[in-house]
């Protein structure tokens, strides 16, 4: 796994985004997944990823973090962000992760997190807690 300079650098108001691999990489994805699971105890999580070259590996790492934290992860594969929202809502999952970086160039990637019913997680509703918790986890 890529090593990470542990910080809050990639954490934005509504998601996590940054340059791959300097700010967003497999290590960060694992730690975010594990931190989310440790904080919110989800039983089921939906996860998907976009077409960026780094997305599948980042998705797999986030899935491992969620699984190691006790969640059952349903990987819906390559998809649009709306499909992760739909899967989380329709299948009554406890939350969802989407590996994507919106309009940013292909050397960027990120993680968008939603709670039950596809409700976005933002800085004020849990992302800040994930940001601090990921720093307390042991390095892998």
Which role fits each region the language model picked out?
Residues 1-64, 68-69:
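An N-terminal, well-structured beta->alpha segment
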Residues 133-139:
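Conserved small/polar residues in nucleotide/adenosyl-binding loops
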């Amino acid at each position: 796994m890529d090593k990470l300079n542990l910080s809050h650098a990639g954490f934005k108001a509504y998601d996590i985004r940054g340059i791959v691999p300097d700010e967003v990489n497999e290590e960060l994805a694992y730690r975010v997944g594990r931190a989310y699971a440790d904080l919110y105890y989800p039983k089921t999580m939906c996860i998907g990823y976009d077409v960026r070259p780094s997305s599948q590996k980042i998705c797999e790492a986030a899935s491992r973090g969620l699984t190691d934290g006790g969640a059952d992860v349903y990987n819906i594969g390559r998809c649009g962000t709306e499909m992760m929202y739909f899967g989380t809502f329709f299948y009554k999952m406890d939350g969802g992760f989407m590996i994507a970086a919106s309009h940013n160039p292909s050397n960027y990637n990120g993680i968008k997190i939603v709670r039950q019913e596809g409700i976005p997680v933002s800085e004020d509703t849990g992302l800040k807690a994930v940001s601090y918790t990921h720093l307390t986890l042991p390095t892998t």
